[in-house]
Curated annotation (Swiss-Prot):
PANTHER family: 50S/60S RIBOSOMAL PROTEIN L16 (PTHR12220), LARGE RIBOSOMAL SUBUNIT PROTEIN UL16M (PTHR12220:SF13)
SUPFAM superfamilies cross-referenced by the UniProt entry: Ribosomal protein L16p/L10e
Name under which the protein is recorded: Large ribosomal subunit protein uL16
Short name of any one Pfam family annotated for the protein: Ribosomal_L16
Keyword Repressor tagged: no
Similarity annotation: Belongs to the universal ribosomal protein uL16 family.
Any one Gene Ontology cellular component term annotated for this protein: cytosolic large ribosomal subunit
CDD domains in the record: Ribosomal_L16_L10e
Positions with biased composition (Basic residues): 1-21
Role description: Binds 23S rRNA and is also seen to make contacts with the A and possibly P site tRNAs.
Region of interest called Disordered, as start-end residue ranges on this chain: 1-22
């Protein structure tokens, strides 16, 4: 699973989901992308499941870029534990995805293959997404 090698703070405050994505809203690497329509925390397991779904569908052709990384730990206290005695231990890692963020990019495959691969990946994620592709001038647009 994806997680940082080391972090400055082991148990930070929970990440915010307010607002739209500041960066990463345009295609940078690939020809096709999967863009978030709504915000959510995406866990490292969900990112990995989406990556596997894309990889299996496109087989050996094409290249995949993952533009999100789970760098926020989410803590949990054990079940039936009394209140107090500090903050819980880190349980899993999440990436904060805000509306407009391009999460996955693909290149080297046809549009039909990319559309289906990203559709399969979107079923592994807990948010609404849309397929975007690079225009002739270089800008991305939705379809």
């Amino acid at each position: 699973m994806l997680m940082p090698k080391r972090v400055k703070y082991r148990r930070p405050h929970r990440p915010s989901l307010k607002g739209k994505a500041k960066g990463g809203t345009q295609l940078h690497f690939g020809e096709y992308g999967l863009q978030a329509v709504e915000g959510a925390w995406i866990t490292s397991q969900q990112i990995e499941a989406a990556r596997v779904a894309i990889s299996r569908y496109i087989r050996r052709g094409g290249k995949i870029w993952i533009n999100i990384f789970p760098d926020h730990p989410i803590t949990r206290k054990p079940a039936e534990t009394r209140m107090g005695s500090g903050k819980g231990a880190p349980e899993y890692w999440v990436a904060v995805v805000k509306p407009g963020k391009i999460m996955f990019e693909l290149a080297g495959v046809s549009e039909e293959v990319a559309r289906e691969a990203l559709r399969l990946a979107s079923h592994k994620l807990p948010i609404k997404t849309k397929f975007v592709k690079r225009e002739v001038g270089g800008e991305a647009h939705e379809s």
